[in-house]
Amino acid sequence: NFHNVWYRGTVEFRWFEGTLHAGKVKSYVQFVLALAAKGLNGRAASSRKREFKPESAKYDFRVFLLHLGLIGDEFKTARKPLLSAMPGDAAFKRGRPQPKPQTTEMANVTVLEG
């Protein structure tokens, strides 16, 4: 809501649902503060629109949060509620890789009995 910029000199972010959970409120506040700091201190912004890919949405948002400076154990509790409802895997861009099947070659093994 940019009307408050002219009346009160503030900006409102009406993105979040109301909650009384202290951890969620803290994570929302930290996210908005980091976003505002990036907007004030950023040197450039990209106007290129990216397409939404559900399989990498959580990973992309996690990387964005890290880019905002929400890095480390002190912001772990801030990242968790923001990423919890997103689809995809936070650790892998193209989904968790499938393990390769292990082949056992027992035909060439000779058993020695002693």
Question: Predicted regions: what is each one?
Answer:
Residues 1-114:
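C-terminal accessory/tail domains of diverse enzymes
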